[in-house]
Amino acid sequence: MEEKHLTRAILIGADTGEYDAESSMDELSELAKTAGAEELARVLQKREAYEPATVIGEGKLAEVKELCGSLGAELLIFDCELTASQIRNVEDETDVRVIDRTMLILDIFAGRAVSREGKLQVELAQLKYRL
C-alpha cells in the first residue's frame, strides 16, 4: 500500500484580541489535517494590529523562516485572510508557499469535488478569491 505524502506545514496566527485565537488555531489545525497537511508547529503572536506587510512582526517572521529551515516546512498557513502583497512578502522572505484560511478551505472543496461542474465551480471560486 502506497503511503500518502502529507504537506509539511506551519500554522501562523496573530492574536489581536478580537476573537479566541487559540480556538481558531485549533480549528485551523483540523482544517489543515483535512486538507492533507502535517502540522509541524504553531506560531501565534500577540499584536495590537496586523503588520500591514506581513501580518506578523519582523522578528516573528525571522523566527518562522528559521523554523521553515529546521523543520523542512513546505507550506505556511495563516489563520486570517491575506492580501496578494502579504502572501508575496512572506513567500519572498521564507521561500515557502503561503496560503490563508480561505484558500485552505477552497483547497479542501477542490479535493472533494467529484463532478465536472463541481470541480469547475470550485476552480472558479479559487480564481475569484485569488484576484
PLM region spans:
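Extended, highly charged alpha-helical segments
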Residues: 93, 104-131
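N-terminal accessory targeting/assembly segments
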Residues: 1-107
